[in-house]
Design a protein with these regions (language model features):
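Exported/periplasmic ABC-transporter solute-binding proteins
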Residues: 2-149
Length: 149
């Protein structure tokens, strides 16, 4: 149905750094006074894999049970990493962008219809609409990426 990628935010009003390359992302994370990431699968990836791929020691704090963006908005952390769809709705932060694709971790969302569904035709119609070109602007506005069929 859609792919979800990891992005980075800073507090609203802070300078918006460039993270278009691995080197730029590494510099931003290295120079940040504090880094936050979620306790979800994307945060585990950041903690266990991203820093290694960037060739730097792990840095930051895993935030449990609350959106990372909220902690950045309050000023508790300078930068935050989480899935884009979870960062975009947070007020008080500036979305910097997605991390570079070669160090990215993508979560793919898929859907299916159970064999014993009470309304399989309606479910099929809904899924077909959600995957249609007409629905993609809305999907993308939430921070998710369309999947080619």
């Amino acid at each position: 149905m859609a792919d979800s990628r990891i992005g980075l935010v800073v507090k609203e009003g802070a300078a918006k750094p460039s993270i278009n390359t691995d080197a730029e992302l590494k510099a931003v994370l290295s120079q940040a006074k504090s880094v936050a990431y979620s306790d979800s699968a994307s945060g585990v990836y950041v903690e266990k894999e991203l820093f290694k791929k960037l060739g730097m020691p792990a840095k930051g704090t895993m935030i449990e049970r609350v959106p990372v963006g909220e902690q950045v908005a309050k000023g508790d952390y300078e930068v935050g990493l989480q899935q884009v769809a979870e960062l975009l709705p947070v007020k008080g932060v500036t979305f910097v962008g997605k991390i570079p694709e070669d160090v990215q971790s993508v979560t793919r969302f898929a859907a299916g219809i159970p064999v014993n569904a009470k309304h399989p035709e309606q479910a099929k119609a809904l899924l077909q609409f959600m995957a249609s070109p007409e629905a993609q602007p809305e999907v993308q506005s939430t921070g998710l990426d369309s999947v080619s069929r």
